[in-house]
């Protein structure tokens, strides 16, 4: 099995770690937004997102990356009456609009200052410029000035089944493939089979109140060139799980397009959010139909690298849709307390997407028992009071995976722990003699792998030590070091300054600030004990050089690329107006990037010339 298959197997068998969940989400986002293939169903993705608790839906596209002119958020999801009622209390309205949640490619069409542009959603902040496709969707019609439309690019089910079903797994994968295709590979007949369906009209300035949804619909209908998504108007007494589930089935059966839920919107004016998900609208999703009752036999508590306990709910083996299921994720301690899940509880269970075991309700509460020697961390999690063997092994394993040390698995670390290797520091100081318990040949291989890890980038080391806490890995640490080359010489960090770094949001900034003192201690320990021999992010010449975005063509020398990152230069995969210098291996070679750089006046330097000027 390749890495993706291994992650999927672990996810579906509830043996996946938090770090692996992040990797799986990144891969799922990549496949969903950039390819014609999906590795998780919508239900499976929703469950993964719930397990991670905090997630950014979407993935930066691989072609024609560009900053989006407007924030294109996703939607919070609700599944039951309790969640619906909580939302209704926050967003009161006389009328609610129920739209089909179409399963296509989300896009934005915008006419600002009489310039018509189109973009796919990407990750909400960075998307793909698809302005060259506008003429295929709205023909000769023009959107009024200072107006934007959020739309779905989609294909009719009938058209897909007649013409493309043999080659694509589902309609959405076909649409994604057509939209993300390079201009020179466009097939006009395929584009002509796509439909553009509007679901939000945005007026400028965007920081002022937007019109209510019914008014938006009237305006869009007057434009007379674009179809609005199918909708119904209801009052709040009909906003129940049962009524919406029936409505979903009805609308899905009658829909010309694939849909994967309902969108509920309060019919009131609203301010568009500039980050996160909108408050005036939510998505209603229907869980799988194969729901069974099951009795809980016991709760298994597993400790992770940070000492946090993750519960696994074991049940009397129960068959769901032909597969016997015996355990489910319990998310966290507070989840079990709130739901009343413990030994003897009768729970309602299903397999989301016919794959992932999922608890969807509780019919009868049970008795919850906790592990020994725990304490509360925050509002929902419990942690170990004393560091256990299991926790230390997972810490070392996380380090091994972060710095890419081959040949070392959990069983290897378990054996080392039993022979006195009880910390990352001791692991890094292992001699070949210490490793002889694995035999002369394997001991030499493991020793050499550990020694090579000393040369890994410092951001990998800090990620391996979990210096800034869970979910802050090498990518975000690298952003920090690029912004602050002397990071660990600073007394403290300002959360507002951190948020100004592209790629770091307010929650991440707060976590970095909270962990900064501990991260400094870890960093100083690494340096003082000579556990690191790689390149530090020293300020050297970059303090006197104005940093900028560069593009590299004709060479992917890993040492040079790493040095660019270390010095704080931002790498672009393509020539854009924000690129200042194109770095080439050979000045005489006229590539596509060289031609484009010349056409827009971007400076072109050879690798050696760039080093001489900026390093």
From Swiss-Prot:
Pfam families cross-referenced by the UniProt entry: DNA_ligase_aden, DNA_ligase_OB
Reaction equations catalysed: NAD(+) + (deoxyribonucleotide)n-3'-hydroxyl + 5'-phospho-(deoxyribonucleotide)m = (deoxyribonucleotide)n+m + AMP + beta-nicotinamide D-nucleotide
Name of the featured protein: Putative DNA ligase 205R
Presence of the UniProt keyword Disulfide bond in the record: no
Species whose genome carries this gene: Invertebrate iridescent virus 6 (IIV-6)
Residues at the active site: 101
Keyword annotations of the record: DNA replication, Ligase, NAD
E.C. designation(s): 6.5.1.2
Family recorded in the similarity comment: Belongs to the NAD-dependent DNA ligase family.
GO MF annotation list: DNA ligase (NAD+) activity
Highest taxon above the source species: Viruses
Gene3D superfamilies according to UniProt: 5' to 3' exonuclease, C-terminal subdomain, BRCT domain, DNA ligase/mRNA capping enzyme, Nucleic acid-binding proteins
Function: Catalyzes the formation of phosphodiester linkages between 5'-phosphoryl and 3'-hydroxyl groups in double-stranded DNA using NAD as a coenzyme and as the energy source for the reaction.
BP term (GO), one: DNA repair
Classification via SUPFAM superfamilies: DNA ligase/mRNA capping enzyme, catalytic domain, Nucleic acid-binding proteins, RuvA domain 2-like
Top enzyme class: ligase
